[in-house]
């Protein structure tokens, strides 16, 4: 779990280093920024294909694995994590279109940077929190903080508030993810970890995508979006 936290920290650091130059390039040529992104993804694909081909789950899941992954604790934790990931997807696109319309695309770069810094900080703090708190408590705190931030932002509004919400939400999401990973490893010792986490991550990514669709189709006022964030995280 701590290894995953370190990987998240590294990916956040790389993203933070790349976002500044790309924003500068995008200011002069959006096509150039997109081409650079395509080049990076292409290089990553080539590197991934060079990894050793190993079967993570050569055999179907056994009864013990299925039973453990259906335990109440894991089911509730996965539902909580799905809510968190959905909120992050919604918030990302809500901020993109709202800030672009009301303030400008450059200001969205500040929110994107705050999101990256929040994820990095969460991955840095989460292992330390895990030594002091139970994983269920960490997940509850993560949801509560996101809900509180959303409601507070709905009451105040403004660009600075949006940037703070982006930081807090991604900070809490990183903590929640480490807590979820720990719960699965603790409560499903007989499960194939690679297979289990691949399935959960697929569900979480789908939640991120589906929750991001409404603000793509309907640009809503900033404070309305923050109400949605607060309500979804609260329930």
Protein language model regions, located:
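Helix-loop junctions at membrane interfaces in 12-TM secondary transporters
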Residues: 154-166
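Helix-loop junctions on the cytosolic side of multi-pass membrane transporters
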Residues: 37-62
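Helix-loop boundary and gating motifs at the non-cytosolic
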Residues: 64-115
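Structural signature of the two symmetry-related core transmembrane helices
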Residues: 35-38, 137-152, 230
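MFS-fold secondary transporters
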Residues: 48, 149-154, 169
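Helix-to-coil boundary motifs at intracellular loop junctions of multi-pass secondary transporters
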Residues: 98-104, 132-133, 154, 183-188
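A membrane-interface helix-boundary motif in multi-pass transporters
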Residues: 23-39, 106, 216-234
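Substrate-agnostic recognition of the 12-TM MFS/MFS-like secondary transporter fold
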Residues: 1-26, 49, 84-88, 115-127, ...
